[in-house]
Each structure stands twice: as C-alpha cells, then as structure tokens.
Amino acid sequence: MSIKAPFNLNKWIAENRGLLKPPVGNKNLYKDAGDYIVMIVAGPNARKDYHYNETEELFYQLEGNIEVHIQENGEKRTMQLGPGDMYLHPAKVPHSPVRKEGSIGLVIERKRANMNVDD
C-alpha cells in the first residue's frame, strides 16, 4: 500500500457532497487502512436501533448537529454535538447516532473482524 498524501477534508466534503445522500450517507475515506475505519457521515439517517462496538468510537462534528443516544447503567442519555464538538464513545456501550438533514461528521472506529468497509 502506498502512503496517501494529506488532503483538505473541507474541500473533499465540498466536492463530494453528492455522495453523502441517503440511503447510505457515508463514505469511507481510507478503504485500504489496516486498523481503522475513517468515515464522513451525513444526515439525515433513520436509524433508531442501538448497537455497540467492542472498541471506542470517535465522533467529530463538522456541520449541523448529531444526537448520540446512549444507554448508561440502564438509563437513556443523549450526547448532543454541534460543529466543532468531539465525543469519544466508550467500548461496549449501546448507542444510536441520530443525524438530521445538514449534519456531517467524521467518525473513526476500529475495524471489526470479517467486516466489509468499502463504503
């Protein structure tokens, strides 16, 4: 794998906004990465289920807002992020990210075994 050159993320978003539409709404920025999934994720999304990862997940909000609903000790709690906000979600904690129209964020998580990460 060749080493990728740095790029301007804001420029990438401006040039690729059309790719960030439902039903998928996300794009893996480094398909060849060995350990991490680095995604730009846009809203809106209709996800209402909770899921969890075996490892931590980093949310960095670029545009608009996101609510990350979590289950903490059996109680529902909501983490609200706006532009410039960052949140490191703990491993093995159920969560449900909800993005509205106009929401764009960077999400970084470790790859899971047997995972297809093309998009």
Model segments located where?
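His/acidic/aromatic-lined binding-pocket segments of jelly-roll/cupin-type domains
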Residues: V38, D49-Y52, E56-Q61, T78-M79, ...
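Short acidic-glycine-tyrosine-enriched beta hairpin
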Residues: E72-K92
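A short, N-terminal "cap"/entry segment at the start of jelly-roll beta-barrel domains
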Residues: M1-A42, R47-D49
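Short acidic/polar mixed-charge low-complexity motifs
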Residues: I37, A46, I66, E75-R77
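Short, conserved beta-strand element in jelly-roll/cupin
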Residues: V41-A42, Y52-Q71, G105-R110
